[in-house]
């Protein structure tokens, strides 16, 4: 049996578990009697992820659901393959249904012609709709669903205790998920989602890309100010050629450096 590397009681991040970067961050929520996955990444890493789950001695039949934080291909391209293996349901926001069902290459960010990016996005069916305020019970764990639009209109975040699996809302370096009108991004909505995170009692952010990090309101405020300026900049756009955070992330994973988050005190 492979040792389970919990970053917090009941939470395993599969990149940390693997010791190398598989793609987007994939969170396994261990509720004891059952478990679920938040995102799955690309199809070509599904077999490795499920093999890791087997090696950690999680019964595959005990997978409650696969949650799509949003409809982007880098998070969900492997969903149908994983569903076929695990014989479970796929859960996501109502606004993710159509782009996933149609495999829309623009709305799922599977195709970016200007950057010569193309990922085959097979149609994917959401079985269970989840939205703002819903509670997902998985064994002895509860996840609270937040709808945090901005990067996409179907972006979800999931709260457990004082941790937020925050999707593509913000990363450790203050960057945010790509903003693209063709992809359904909305800057005013994004600002409101970031303000909600800033004003919450969340202590730790578990993003969909890059390292887990402690919530710092100064970082959030700086990002909010930057996005507020974007609303009035006609030259706004992103054609980034590199993202140094992912290089740092690679080093931290391979060196086994990851945060050990203390359980939330209830007294």
Per-region residue spans from a language model:
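Conserved beta-strand hairpin/beta-sheet module of binuclear metal-dependent hydrolase folds
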Residues: 2-56, 157-167, 171
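Short Pro/Gly-enriched beta-strand edge/turn motifs at strand-loop
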Residues: 7-14, 113-118, 140
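Short, charged, surface-exposed secondary-structure boundary motifs
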Residues: 23, 99-103, 174-175, 180
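Metallo-beta-lactamase
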Residues: 35, 42-44, 135, 142-149, ...
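Active-site HxH/HxHxD metal-binding segment of metal-dependent hydrolases
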Residues: 42-47, 54-135, 225, 229-233
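C-terminal regulatory/interaction regions
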Residues: 236-267
